[in-house]
Amino acid sequence: MTSYTFSRELRLLTPAQFKSVFSNPIKASSAEITLLAIPNIEQHPRLGLTVAKRFVKRANQRNRIKRVIRESFRLNQHDIPALDIVVLVRNGVMEMENADLNKLIEKLWRKLSRRYNG
């Protein structure tokens, strides 16, 4: 049976792991969100999130955005290639409803997969 958990092994945890993604990444972006990714040696994708206070002032809004992105990753993790992915949130995402944010992030997962696979 396929597991849909979001365990510790599916997360980017250390600053070194985040930093490695910023060197020569594969990009997929929209006006509100940018995904940066590099291939990893694991058999599964890993996710790191950054939601800057500069763009989303309130903690509850930052947490909502991260929750929606994590949930989308959890449900789509088996369709995403083995990449280390950092999600950068920019201006404009705070005004988005959860459903719209979910649609946007799923579109970006597909775009990233296409760019990685060629």
From Swiss-Prot:
GO MF annotation terms: 3'-tRNA processing endoribonuclease activity; ribonuclease P activity; tRNA binding
Organism classification: Bacteria, Pseudomonadati, Pseudomonadota, Gammaproteobacteria, Alteromonadales
Name assigned to this protein: Ribonuclease P protein component
One Gene Ontology cellular component annotation held by this UniProt entry: ribonuclease P complex
Keyword vocabulary terms for this entry: Endonuclease, Hydrolase, Nuclease, RNA-binding, tRNA processing
Record-listed E.C. numbers: 3.1.26.5
PROSITE patterns from the UniProt entry: RIBONUCLEASE_P
General function of this protein: RNaseP catalyzes the removal of the 5'-leader sequence from pre-tRNA to produce the mature 5'-terminus. It can also cleave other RNA substrates such as 4.5S RNA. The protein component plays an auxiliary but essential role in vivo by binding to the 5'-leader sequence and broadening the substrate specificity of the ribozyme.
Organism: Shewanella denitrificans (strain OS217 / ATCC BAA-1090 / DSM 15013)
